[in-house]
Structure formats: structure tokens, C-alpha cells
Amino acid sequence: MTRKFKAAIIGSGNIGTDLMIKIMRHGRHIEVGAMVGIDPASDGLARASRLGVGTTHEGVEGLTRLPIFEEIDFVFDATSAGAHVHNDALLRKYKPGIRVIDLTPAAIGPYCIPVVNGKQNLDALNVNMVTCGGQATVPMVAAVSRVTQVHYGEIVASIASKSAGPGTRANIDEFTETTSKAIEVVGGASKGKAIIVLNPADPPLIMRDTVYTLSDVADEAAIADSVARMAADVQSYVPGYRLKQTVQFDRVENLNVPGVGRISGLKTSIFLEVEGAAHYLPAYAGNLDIMTSAGLRTAEQMAARMTAGTVAA
């Protein structure tokens, strides 16, 4: 039997706890070695302890003092953008070659969207999983980009307010900045813009995303087919990811886009929804589910490469 690589999860909140459950249920090459938090009374640490996972409420410093740290090859950071910079530096002081999956908007490593550029980043020591909105929408921008030149990409991510914990709320500015940049760097748009909406509806609604691209005129059927194939690729690790309706197309003439200028061409509108797998969080928290699923997929592919020298299918 192939040995599993041990991973530590930093951040015992919603994302960290959901990730722990996912790894326990679905990890093929990864297993949970430790859960790290800063609140000794957190539900995530208590749950990890009940499940037999080593815990510490003393942050990364506490992790380095755990006996299991010697065996840790992967770290998932589910804290905040500001904390991640400190965490990565401290981890590398003890283990320069440790693999860090950054689930915050810090982006000190390359942006990673598994279905778009995951395989190009398998040797990176730190990868950034962008944001929940980025994981849901950048693949769609990329789907259009592989058919035609995208001059502008804009996304609106609407998430249930109840699914937004303190980390998400503290990182709203970083969310928009990181997602906008990923639309360009990974999605292939010349200019990107991201908007996040915290929907206060009760009962909570599942994550919904709208993607707009302005591109050169191209074969609409080819774009629709590319979008459908990309959606199926994302569904391979986020089963609740789906197109809400058919892709819509409009011709635009001399449209003024702030920061870009006047554009004529094809406007493509893509409507998505993401339902969570409800491993730990409610089904409406698809925004958190897509982050943990993408993070685990990336780590699994890295681990498979480390084990066999090839990328897992």
C-alpha cells in the first residue's frame, strides 16, 4: 500500500474543519496529521481531538513543537491573508521544502486553479488557491479564453452571509484584489474585475456566480462547448458545481469599459451555482466547499507526483 503524506491544517474554523473531514473521507495520498488553531475552545480543535488528530491551540509555533511535525509534508493554511505570510516564513525556518497550500487570499505563491493550471504548479512549494469566487469563476473565463481573446472579465460571487466567517469578512478587499488578478493571470483576460456579495437571505441560498466576458467575436457554439467541458472538469472534484442556465451571447458595439476603454465584440454571460457536499458545513456553503475541494485536489496531485513521479489523473 502506498504511504500517505501527513498534512497539518492551520485554522480550525469552517474551512479548516471541513477540509479535515474531506481528507479523512476522501484522501488517497494525504492524511491529517495535526489541526492547528489559536482558540482552545474552538469546535474545530475539539472535533479533531475526538477524531484522534493531534491538536494545538498555540498556532504554528505550537505545531512545530508537536512530535508529529517531523512527519508533516503538507500544510493547508486556512487562516487569513496577513497571518499566512508569517505562517509560511515560520514553517520554512524549520522545513524549507514543506508544501504549503494557501487557502487565504495572501497569494505569495502562484495562483492555482486545478482544472486550468494545476499541473503547471505541482512542483511549487507554496500555491495560492485564490478565493472561493476565483475557484468557481476563473475556469469559466479560461474556457472562453481558450476559444477567443478575452479583453475583459467580470465576476459577481454571491454567497450566503451565514457561510462567511470572520476570516472571510476580514479579507473582503483581498478577495476582490486576488480574484481580479487571477481572472487575468489564470483566466487569460486582459483586465479582470471581481465583486463579492454577502447575501443575508434566510434560509440561506447556495453560492451563485455570474461571469461576464467581453471578447473578440468567435464561434458561439465553440464557446458554449468549451464552457460545458470546463464545468464537467470542475464537477470531477466539486459535484455540486453546475451551470444554472445556457450560456448567453450578445454583440456589443463601442462599449465603454472603465479602465479598459471602448470595446466591440462578443459579450458572454455564464450563470453558475455551487452546492456544498455538506461534509461538515451546510449544503448552502458551496463557497467554502469549492475551496476545500480545490485545495485537496491540488495536494493530492502533488502527493501523487511525489510518490510516482507522475501526475494523478
Curated annotation (Swiss-Prot):
NAD(+) binds at S12, G13, N14, I15, S163, A164, G165, P166, G167, T168, R169, A170, N171, N287. It catalyses: acetaldehyde + NAD(+) + CoA = acetyl-CoA + NADH + H(+). SMART domains: Semialdhyde_dh. Gene3D superfamilies: Dihydrodipicolinate Reductase, domain 2 (3.30.360.10), NAD(P)-binding Rossmann-like Domain (3.40.50.720). Pfam families: AcetDehyd-dimer, Semialdhyde_dh. GO terms for biological process: catabolic process. Signal peptide: none annotated. The keyword Metal-binding does not apply. Keywords: Aromatic hydrocarbons catabolism, NAD, Oxidoreductase. It comes from the Bacteria. GO terms for molecular function: acetaldehyde dehydrogenase (acetylating) activity; NAD binding. InterPro entries: Acetaldehyde_dehydrogenase, Acetylaldehyde_DH_C, NAD(P)-bd_dom_sf, Semialdehyde_DH_NAD-bd. The active site is at C132. Its EC number is 1.2.1.10. Belongs to the acetaldehyde dehydrogenase family. This is Acetaldehyde dehydrogenase 2. The gene is amnH.
